[in-house]
From Swiss-Prot:
Function: Involved in maceration and soft-rotting of plant tissue.
InterPro entries: Pectin_lyas_fold, Pectin_lyase_fold/virulence, Pectinesterase_Asp_AS, Pectinesterase_cat
GO molecular function list: pectinesterase activity
GO cellular component: extracellular region
Annotated family: Belongs to the pectinesterase family.
Signal peptide: 1-19
UniProt protein name: Probable pectinesterase A
Any single GO BP term: pectin catabolic process
Lineage, broadest ranks: Eukaryota, Fungi, Dikarya, Ascomycota, Pezizomycotina
Keywords recorded for this protein, A-Z: Aspartyl esterase, Cell wall biogenesis/degradation, Glycoprotein, Hydrolase, Secreted, Signal
C-alpha cells in the first residue's frame, strides 16, 4: 500500500514538473484575457489607436497585436503597467515573430535621436513580447529603432533592426532576453542600466556594438552582455572590423560575460571616442575566435561576473518575467 502511494506521488510530481516546462515553447495566436486587440479583425486597426484608447488610466493594461507589418511611429507614455504582445507560434524565440513595427526616418531629418525612433517608450513598467521594431533608414545617418527611456522595461524575444544607433537604451533599468539586435555603428547606446541575456547581437557593417554614456562615478548604470552570441549578418564579411564598444561619455561601463565573440571582433576589442574618457570595459569567460584579450586596449580586469542585482537592482524579480 505504501509502495503504491509512493509511486503515485512520484508520478504526480513528474507530471506536474512536465506541465511546468511545457508552456516555454507554446504559441500566442490569440489575445490573452483582458487585452485589447490590433489587426484587420481587431478592436483597432493601428497600434497607435490602441495606445490612444488607454487614455489616462493607471490600471494594468495589455494590447495583443495580430500578425502583420505596421508602418507606424509610436510614443508610449502610459501611467500603468502596460504589456504589448505580438502574435507568435513560439513565445520563447524571436525567430517565429510575425509582428513588425517599422518606420523610416533619420535623426537629422527628425530633428533629434528620440524623434527618429520607430518606438519611443517614456513610461515605466512596459513589457514587450515577440515584436520586431525596425528603422529602415539604413546607412548614412543615425536612425533609431527603439528609444527605451524609462524604468523597469522588459523585452522578451523581440527584434531591433537598424544601422547606426539602433537601440537607444537611454535611462532606467532594462532587461532584454532571447532577442536580436542588429546594426553597425553604436547600435546599443545610452545610459540605461541594461542586461542582455541569450541575445543574438548582429553586426551588418563595420563599426562598434556599444556606445555607453555613463559620465559620473555616482551613476550605477551598466551594460551587461551575458550569454549572448555576437555575429555578422548573413552574407557580410566583417573579419576584424567590429569593436565591442567605444565610450559615448567618459565613464562608459560595459561587460561581456559568458558570450561568444567570433573573428569579426577586432583584436584591440575596444575603441576611443569621448575626449578624456576612462571607460570601464570588462570581459569575463567569453569564448570564440574573437575572445582572446591579449591585445586588448582600454580593458579593465574583473575577477567575477556581474550579477543581475548589480545591473537591474535588488528588486528585479518583481518586474522581470521569470518564465524566460
Amino acid at each position: 500500500m505504501h509502495g503504491s502511494l509512493l509511486k503515485l506521488a512520484l508520478l504526480s510530481f513528474s507530471l506536474a514538473s512536465s506541465a511546468a516546462v511545457l508552456p516555454r515553447d507554446t504559441g500566442r495566436t490569440s489575445a490573452p484575457s483582458g487585452c485589447s486587440t490590433v489587426g484587420t479583425s481587431g478592436d483597432y486597426s493601428t497600434i497607435g489607436d490602441a495606445l490612444t484608447a488607454l487614455g489616462s488610466s493607471t490600471a494594468d493594461a495589455c494590447i495583443y497585436i495580430a500578425a502583420g507589418t505596421y508602418e507606424e511611429q509610436l510614443v508610449i507614455n502610459y501611467a500603468g503597467h502596460l504589456t504589448l504582445y505580438g502574435e507568435t507560434t513560439d513565445t520563447q524565440t524571436y525567430k517565429q515573430n510575425t509582428v513588425t513595427i517599422t518606420h523610416t526616418i533619420s535623426s537629422p531629418e527628425a530633428g533629434s535621436l528620440d524623434n527618429s525612433a520607430t518606438v519611443n517608450i517614456k513610461s515605466d513598467l512596459v513589457s514587450v513580447y515577440n515584436i520586431n521594431i525596425a528603422n529602415g533608414y539604413g546607412s548614412g545617418a543615425q536612425a533609431v529603432a527603439l528609444v527605451a527611456n524609462a524604468d523597469q522595461l522588459g523585452f522578451y524575444a523581440c527584434q531591433f533592426t537598424g544601422y547606426q544607433d539602433t537601440l537607444y537604451a537611454k535611462a532606467g533599468h532594462q532587461y532584454y532576453i532571447n532577442s536580436r539586435i542588429e546594426g553597425a555603428v553604436d547600435y546599443i547606446f545610452g545610459d540605461a542600466s541594461a542586461w542582455f541575456e541569450n541575445c543574438d547581437i548582429v553586426s551588418n557593417g563595420a563599426g562598434y556594438i556599444t556606445a555607453m554614456s555613463r559620465e559620473t562615478t555616482s551613476d550605477t548604470a551598466w551594460y551587461a552582455i551575458d550569454h549572448c552570441n555576437i555575429k555578422a549578418a548573413s552574407g557580410v564579411d566583417l573579419t576584424g572590423d567590429v569593436y565591442l564598444g567605444r565610450p559615448w561619455r567618459v565613464l562608459a561601463r560595459v561587460i561581456y560575460q559568458y558570450s561568444v565573440l567570433p573573428d569579426i571582433i577586432n583584436a584591440k576589442g575596444w575603441h576611443s571616442m569621448a575626449d578624456g574618457a576612462t571607460p570601464l570595459y570588462y570581459e569575463f569567460n567569453n569564448t570564440g575566435a574573437g575572445s582572446d584579450t591579449s591585445d586588448r586596449e582600454y580593458l579593465s580586469t574583473i575577477d567575477a561576473p556581474v550579477a543581475k542585482e548589480t545591473v537591474l537592482g535588488d528588486d528585479y524579480k518583481n518586474w522581470v518575467d521569470s518564465s524566460y
